Amino acid sequence: MAYPLQLGLQDATSPIMEELMNFHDHTLMIVFLISSLVLYIISLMLTTKLTHTSTMDAQEVETIWTILPAVILIMIALPSLRILYMMDEINNPVLTVKTMGHQWYWSYEYTDYEDLCFDSYMVPTNDLKPGELRLLEVDNRVVLPMELPIRMLISSEDVLHSWAVPSLGLKTDAIPGRLNQATVTSNRPGLFYGQCSEICGSNHSFMPIVLEMVPLKHFENWSASMI
């Protein structure tokens, strides 16, 4: 989860988030190099007073500043497209969970089980226990097995919502009348927090998401106790 004054991204929990962080570093380095070059040229012009008032045509320079930006854009676009395709791929999911957005809570249905469904509301501040997080705790967590591909089907009952868990690299719109899907795969156990990331009304800020990733054996015990 995020902390006050945090400058970096949250720790990656899924392969997709690891790829996104690598892509972020790759793109940031390109931006840093271009910015440094531009600032160096500007400072050089201001300090040396070098100008070329007589230059009317420079075919080589024009060729370079046409080809070079194209190469840079390709270097950014190719890794980005690769990650986009990875995010859309869902290979043999072991579990499917249907998520519905409401004003202002989430409901979950484990479609592989007959009667495993529940609503998930934010815990009011007055009901928090010591150590729990304000505006992030819920009464019913989404319990999922770790290290296994899980398909999330996401939609909405009323207005636009967005189901987002940053540490897993997830952000999928919940649109009324449309079923979107995403893949959840966690490399480690733990609690992972998210929130609705689409302004959906007066209580938009009070729609937290909590995923509890556990070993498969613990998940089987939990699901048996819930049915």
Swiss-Prot record:
Cofactor note: Binds a dinuclear copper A center per subunit.
Catalytic activity: 4 Fe(II)-[cytochrome c] + O2 + 8 H(+)(in) = 4 Fe(III)-[cytochrome c] + 2 H2O + 4 H(+)(out)
Binding site for Mg(2+): 198
Cofactor annotation: Cu cation
Location of the protein in the cell: Mitochondrion inner membrane
Transmembrane segments: 15-45, 60-87
SS bonds (residue pairs): none
Main location: mitochondrion
Enzyme class: translocase
Function according to Swiss-Prot or TrEMBL: Component of the cytochrome c oxidase, the last enzyme in the mitochondrial electron transport chain which drives oxidative phosphorylation. The respiratory chain contains 3 multisubunit complexes succinate dehydrogenase (complex II, CII), ubiquinol-cytochrome c oxidoreductase (cytochrome b-c1 complex, complex III, CIII) and cytochrome c oxidase (complex IV, CIV), that cooperate to transfer electrons derived from NADH and succinate to molecular oxygen, creating an electrochemical gradient over the inner membrane that drives transmembrane transport and the ATP synthase.
Family stated for the protein in its record: Belongs to the cytochrome c oxidase subunit 2 family.
Protein name per UniProt: Cytochrome c oxidase subunit 2
Originating species: Zelotomys hildegardeae
Gene that specifies this protein: MT-CO2
